[in-house]
């Protein structure tokens, strides 16, 4: 579908046992930007974790000089080395689905490597997501990912919760 602004929109319905997920990908024809939208129409309340928007980084962003920049509540961005092995998505126990992630309180993450950057952006007032990182090496290659968590669970979760829509953009500026 070509939108009025000239952008290209691709829409798909993904049927799951919990209900349909409507995924929309919009590619800008004016800038280096792709937007993704996830909607969960008619979903019942969910008791568990929900992770989506998995971004797998190319190997050129998996080197030791890759940096992650985001704000974790302060005025300025914090800078993290995206090196070594770690997996924020790994549950620490059977009662807790995750023990770590990024605050990214401004709804922005920048991934930098050798003068190149990828920017992820969302509106935290619309979607309270927690970005998680995964970096793992095997056979002289590295798997590097950013994953968004909409829900995590622990032993204090008593009631199921609604799943809201989530949208974010990927850009190079």
Regions found by a protein language model. Give the residues of each.
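Short, solvent-exposed aromatic-acidic interface loops
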Residues: 41-43, 73-76
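Beta-strand-rich recognition/accessory modules
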Residues: 1-24, 28-52, 89-173
């Amino acid at each position: 579908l070509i939108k009025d602004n000239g952008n290209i929109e691709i829409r798909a319905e993904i049927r799951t046992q919990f209900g349909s997920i409507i995924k929309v990908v919009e590619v800008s024809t004016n800038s280096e930007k792709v937007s993704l939208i996830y909607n969960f129409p008619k979903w019942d309340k969910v008791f568990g974790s929900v992770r989506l928007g998995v971004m797998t980084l190319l190997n050129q962003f998996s080197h030791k000089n890759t940096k992650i920049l985001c704000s974790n509540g302060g005025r300025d961005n914090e800078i993290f080395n995206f090196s070594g092995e770690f997996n924020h998505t790994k549950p620490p126990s059977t009662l807790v689905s995750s023990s770590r992630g990024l605050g990214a309180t401004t709804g922005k993450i920048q991934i930098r490597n050798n003068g190149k950057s990828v920017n992820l952006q969302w509106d935290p007032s619309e979607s309270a997501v927690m970005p998680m990182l995964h970096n793992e090496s095997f056979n002289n290659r590295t798997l590097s990912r950013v994953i968004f968590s909409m829900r995590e669970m622990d032993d204090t979760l008593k009631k199921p919760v609604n799943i809201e829509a989530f949208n974010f953009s990927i850009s190079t500026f």
